[in-house]
Amino acid sequence: METSGGYAPGGKDTGLVKPKGSSSIRAHEGLDTVPMRGRKPEWLKVRSPGGSEYLRLKGLMRSRALHTVCEEAGCPNIGECWEAGTATFMILGDVCTRACKYCAVAHGLPTELDLEEPARVADTVRAMALEHVVITSVNRDELADGGAGIYAETISRIHKAVPGCSVEVLIPDLKGDESALRVVMEARPAILGHNLETVERLHPDVRPGGRYWRSISFLGAAKRIDASLLTKTGIILGMGEEAGEIRQAMSDLREAAVDILTLGQYLRPSMQHIPVARWVTPAEFAEWKRVGEEHFGFGHVEAGPLVRSSYHAKEQARAVEAGEPGSIQRVLEGDIPAPAEVLPGFDLVQLEIGRPGRLNPGAVRRAPHNLRLPRPDEPG
């Protein structure tokens, strides 16, 4: 397990916080974006958290020195989920080495690894009597394995402490390191998630530490390593993307054989983050769910204004496993092969990157498929 290479603490629980940079991006030039303090649509209004179960879980997390992405990322569903006794654990500290322009998690210099964290997480999962748990983390780019060893240890500890509890992980790209990915997968999570976050054009501006094709290839590599593993990703809408770009992202994700997709509305955490380009309506989300499942063959699409990566995660997993409409069984029968499955010798993870957010010409050949949707100006 990688244990060295961290930074001295200070400013946050596990590191030194730094500014994320400018909140303006090129994609918003000429757009009439949503004011920070503008009135939100009715469908985005949620009840403030504070029920008895919420307070119990908050006390439990504090007493065990654990972090949740529900709190750190300012998730709007925290009241609903915590009252239902579910939470998404965030490991590897609470300071991220990357400065994504949409994310509320603190950016800066993380501290040393907490080697006792996996045991505390497993003990808390047992105390909560969970049947399905989601584990995510900050990026730890200063670590040789990106934190993969701690992920694997956490998964293994949960399996031992709570036999029968399924473990879903939402991992960073681990800098595209397939050996680190294998470390996580060898611990046998039930679902492996990695979020694409946005369309290719917006990546350089809003996700400067990530790469569109690195994320696509990372998800495809997981399927190449273990085709039976369910894979999952999420895209945030309302940051300036266009309909054709969403369809293209869906197409690219299905080429990587991704099973589950989540789609949710971007909510601006602060003035230091990029503005909301527009509010996506519930009807639009419902249509994207239909498009994703019926046209592109995703095993399940969870789409809605308040949907986040781990929202209704247990229900998503059970629905796909049970073979409900849009299920993985149907997907596997007529699946679109990932590039790694059809191109001999294709190294899906280690892509050659050109300028930020763009793939060098010739660095990868695209796999053929027959599920591309028509452009917006073409008849459906």
Could you say what each language-model-derived stretch is?
Residues 76, 97, 200:
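Nucleotide phosphate-binding site architecture
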Residues 104-120, 125-220, 232-233, 260-262:
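Core AdoMet radical
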Residues 1-88, 123, 153-164, 185-187, ...:
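Auxiliary Fe-S-binding modules of radical SAM enzymes
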Residues 99, 143, 202, 271, ...:
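Glycine/Thr-rich phosphate-binding loops of Rossmann-like dinucleotide-binding domains
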Residues 94, 172-175, 240:
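Short, surface-exposed acidic/glycine-rich loop or hinge patches that mediate macromolecular interfaces
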Residues 93, 168, 324-326:
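Short, intrinsically disordered/low-complexity patches at protein termini
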Residues 34-44, 80-117:
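Canonical Radical SAM [4Fe-4S] cluster-binding loop centered on the CxxxCxxC motif
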Residues 71, 91-92, 136, 170, ...:
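A secondary-structure boundary/capping signal
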